[in-house]
């Protein structure tokens, strides 16, 4: 569908409201045209619940990576929680079941140069990050399920 693009930009974020968490992502072309969004509310799991919005951001990054792999082939994951990239690159150690699962899922895509990472400061008006933040919040408020799996 978007294979003609050299890459896409995927902004990801997570949110937590009253102990429930969710994630969202927004896909942009290299010239910043919004082409796809998705979001989903998280499952009720003690470890994931304790990780709060980080669980949503991990989930959004994994879903965005699947979208990138299927629809374009290369993308940059823009994130405001630095651990998303530090775990995958090995700069930070994982010590929880779900962060290890996240790394096991993401590292092959990173190693094959399908994805790369770019940190952005949250809540500073970066459009893609604000859209992803809104999507993550809406996933909880409206009990949304991921469209693309």
Q: PLM features: what roles do these ranges have?
A:
Residues 52, 56-60, 128, 132-135:
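Generic hydrophobic secondary-structure packing signal
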Residues 27-28, 93-96, 135:
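Glycine-rich, phosphate-binding/catalytic loops in enzymes
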Residues 1-55, 59, 65-68:
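RNase H-like nuclease fold core
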Residues 15-19, 62-131, 144-146:
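RNase H catalytic domain
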Residues 133, 137-149:
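Charged phosphate-binding loop/patch that engages nucleotide di/tri-phosphates or the phosphate backbone
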